[in-house]
Design a protein with these regions (language model features):
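Extended, solvent-exposed functional surface patches
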Residues: 1-158, 167, 250-251
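Long, domain-scale non-catalytic interaction/scaffolding regions in large secretory-pathway
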Residues: 12-22, 157-160, 166-336
Length: 336
């Protein structure tokens, strides 16, 4: 049986890293990439090649392929997966259930976090010029009905899941440009105690988007962050979340989702370049196994942080170099 040991690090600008291997472990191999683009493309390929096609996975594939299209556009490469995107959109449209939303498979009963992933994918596709057949008014009516139906039970829910659902519904209605009484809904949701850090962060994001006067200062959100041994920032509940049968199937309530929410808040607040870089580094630290955990998280991480890393300068990226034991390398990928 062979066993490997290693370290993963993100080197920004002129950063230096001291790595002292254990001679008893044998030969050391160093692999370096010049930018994060290959990591994104690898993640996109993993999502694209994933063999199963539940509604979440199809929506995640759409998101991933749209991200691939943006990368290819940047580098002047021909995108050849339009038919694949169109086919996925057609299947998602056919799987919309009688409640105008989506469940795990086919036209099963609604799962709100899956519906959110699907709706976001459809809206992103429309922005890129694809036809989705999405009936926005019917969808708006369904989401608004779901919001009103869930409100009474949310105030007394101690798990945070009901509040999380309300936040998702209001967020989707905003993305659909629905004409609803946002101040009333925001005030009600904000009045519900936060049972989780995710509740607190998502409430802050809702207020930032819809009621800025009630938005907490960015510094107060940074005070809630945790740090990895490498100094990367992430957001985790200090106490373990109460286990429930539903929570196992709620990937939208996790450290990753908390950290993505914090990232979006700080990006929108502006003047937080250093903090955003440390958050991105956290996500790359989580790829120690070579990929993120699942199609849902991978697609959401890529769509959130990738645009900020597509720093374009005359159509090319700034030159990168790496010095190892005094020897400079300028061609990547590098393996030695």
């Amino acid at each position: 049986i062979l066993e490997t040991h290693g370290e993963f690090a993100v080197l920004n600008d002129t950063a230096a890293l001291r790595f002292t291997p254990d001679p008893a472990l044998g030969t050391v191999t160093i692999h370096a990439e010049a930018s994060a683009m290959q990591a994104f493309l690898d993640e996109i390929e993993n999502i694209d090649l994933y063999p199963h096609l539940c509604n979440e996975q199809m929506a995640s594939k759409v998101k991933a392929l749209l991200s691939k299209k943006r990368i290819y556009t940047l580098f002047g490469r021909k995108f050849k997966d339009d038919d694949k995107v169109t086919n996925l959109l057609r299947k998602l449209a056919a799987n919309q259930n009688d409640g105008k939303l989506w469940g795990w498979w086919n036209r099963e009963q609604t799962e709100l976090w899956i519906s959110q992933q699907v709706v976001e994918a459809l809206l992103d596709a429309e922005t890129e010029g694809y036809k989705t057949g999405l009936d926005r008014q019917a969808l708006t009516d369904a989401l608004l009905a779901g919001l009103n139906r869930r409100m009474p039970a949310a105030a007394s829910d101690s798990t945070g899941m009901r509040k999380n659902e309300l936040l998702s519904l209001v967020g989707l209605l905003r993305k659909l440009d629905a004409r609803i009484d946002y101040p009333r809904y925001c005030a009600f949701i904000a009045s519900i105690p936060d049972a989780t850090l995710g509740n607190r962060l998502r409430t802050a994001e809702m207020l930032q988007q819809l009621a800025p006067d009630g938005m907490p200062a960015a510094d107060s959100l940074l005070a809630l962050a945790s740090r990895t041994m490498m100094g990367s920032l992430y957001w985790r509940d200090k106490a373990p979340l109460e286990p429930t049968p539903r929570r196992f199937a709620q990937p939208d309530m996790s450290d990753v989702e908390n950290t993505l929410t914090a990232y979006r808040i700080l990006r929108a607040a502006g003047n937080r370049k250093a903090e955003l870089e440390k958050i991105r580094n956290y996500f790359f630290e989580q790829r120690k196994s070579g990929s993120w955990r699942n199609t849902y998280e991978s697609s959401r991480i890529v769509e959130t942080i990738m645009p900020d890393m597509l720093e374009k300068d005359g159509g090319t990226f700034r030159e990168a170099s790496l010095t190892i034991d005094g020897q400079r390398f300028g061609k990547f990928p590098l393996t030695r």
